[in-house]
Design a protein with these regions (language model features):
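Extended, loop-rich substrate-binding clefts of extracytoplasmic carbohydrate-active enzymes
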Residues: 5, 9-58
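Beta-strand-rich interaction surfaces with strong enrichment in secreted/lumenal proteins
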Residues: 51-53, 203-208
Length: 223
């Protein structure tokens, strides 16, 4: 709901269903652009430009999202990445490395909404994965106290590390039994069951002034 009008969109927003335009391409990079249109205005009331740049550097893939507000009023938005990685075998054969020991809160979900409940979660350098961890849904940690997550196999093989310095939250997700695992940098998150659905009051919403730009970056380092 924004300024008294209801807007409906799918889970995870509308951008993933749109066609981006290739606006720049170099030897090791490319930039894609999405701008607002009549189609996006049916789901999202603001004018915007969203640029996504992918850059290969040595053994890393850098991903930069640039949001620009070309209009005359503040825009409200959330943004997230959804990198997923193929599993060669069962999820039980893999682990995550958070670079240290952290006590965090997992925010619990009912349907597509946070229900206000949390669960204590201990993260470490050898956090073993299993389908049981994701039986109800994703693990979402708000304001992560770490800036990277390593992904490897229990035999000691290090596969990759996702680096992100300024994420608002991170989601860890798979479908039990599926051949993939996702580490999702987030700047904003789903609504709550007790929300009044007003966009201005949505927890975690990002704000951008007219004619301003904000960038969000993360990288995938291969080992």
């Amino acid at each position: 709901m924004y300024q008294g009008k209801a807007y409906a969109m799918r889970q995870h927003g509308f951008a993933r269903d749109q066609t981006f335009e290739l606006v720049d391409q170099g030897p090791n990079s490319l930039t894609l652009l999405l701008t607002d249109s009549e189609i996006t205005h049916e789901q999202y009331p603001f004018a915007f430009e969203l640029r996504v740049t992918y850059t290969l550097t040595n053994h890393s893939l850098e991903i930069k999202h640039g949001v620009y507000n070309p209009g005359s009023e503040e825009i409200l938005f959330s943004l997230g990445g959804h990198p997923g990685f193929h599993l060669d075998g069962s999820l039980n054969e893999y682990f995550l490395d958070f670079g240290g020991d952290f006590k965090v809160k997992q925010h619990l979900i009912t349907g597509n909404f946070y229900n206000g409940a949390t669960r204590d979660l201990s993260l470490n350098r050898r956090f073993k994965l299993s389908d049981e961890l994701f039986a109800s849904d994703a693990i979402v940690v708000k304001s992560p106290p770490f800036q990277s997550i390593g992904f490897g196999k229990n035999d000691g093989t290090r596969l990759l590390t996702l680096h992100c310095k300024d994420w608002s939250a991170v989601g860890l997700w798979t479908k039990p039994g599926a051949p993939f695992f996702c580490i999702e940098p987030l700047w904003g998150w789903a609504d709550s069951l007790d929300s009044d659905s007003t966009l201005d009051c949505k927890e975690g919403i990002m704000r951008l002034a007219p004619l301003h730009k904000q960038e969000f970056e993360y990288s995938l380092e291969l080992h």
